[in-house]
Amino acid sequence: MFDFASYHRAATLADAINLLADNPQAKLLAGGTDVLIQLHHHNDRYRHIVDIHNLAELRGITLAEDGSLRIGSATTFTQLIEDPITQRLLPALCAAASSIAGPQIRNVATYGGNICNGATSADSATPTLIYDAKLEIHSPRSVRFVPINGFHTGPGKVSLEHDEILVAFHFPPQPKEHVGSAHFKYAMRDAMDISTIGCAAHCRLEERQFQRITPGIWCCRANADSLPTCRTDCTKCAIKPANAGSYQRICPARCRPAFFMAGQ
C-alpha cells in the first residue's frame, strides 16, 4: 500500500495550479513511472499527490499553419513515437523516445515528466535541445515560455518553482529540405538500460557546407548542453572526408564531462 497523506485529482489545469499553491509539499503525478517508485520506498517528500494524468490541457500533438509544433507535456513516449507529425518533423526525438525502457513504460511515461524529473539520464533532453524547443510553464502568477537550454540547472534540478506546471513544448517551424537529425544513446546494456551518454545533432546543409549545426549532449554532463562553441566551430565547415577528424575532435574538446556517471 502507498502511504498517502493526501491525494487530489485535478479537474482542470487551474485546479492543479491552485492545489500546488495550497500545498507546498505536493508532488505532481502524470505517468507516475518515477513518482510511484518514490511512493513504494516510502519517501516522505512524496506523501502529498496532485494527479494531473487526465488534464486535456496537457495532451495532444498539434501542428500550426505556420509549421510550429505544440506537444502537450503529458504526451506519452508511445504517442510521440507513433505520431506521423513527430516522425516527420522530429525524428531524433522519436528515436530517443524509442530507446526509453520497454513498451510498458513508454505507454505511461510522459515527455514532460522525463524533462522535469531532471535526471541526467533523461533520453528526451538532447533531442528537445537540438530542435530549439521552448517550454510553456503556468503558475498562479503568469505564463512563461523558457528555452530548454538552461532549464536544467544540475543533477535532479530544473528551473521550475513548486507551484509551476510544465504544460507544453513548443517547437519552431522545421526546415523541410537539406536538413537531418539523429540521436545516439550509449548504455552499459542494450536492453532497457538508462543512458551513460546521450547525444543528438541537428544540421542544415547548403552548398556542401554545414549552414547550421546544433549538437546536444547529456548524461556525461551535469546539464543538457548545446555546446555553443562547437556549433560555431562546425558551422560553414565543408562536408568532406578530410574534415571528419576535425569534427570528431571538436565536440569532446568542448564537452567537459561531469564527474559522475549516470546510474551510479
Residue ranges of each PLM-predicted region?
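C-terminal structural segment of proteins
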Residues: 1-264
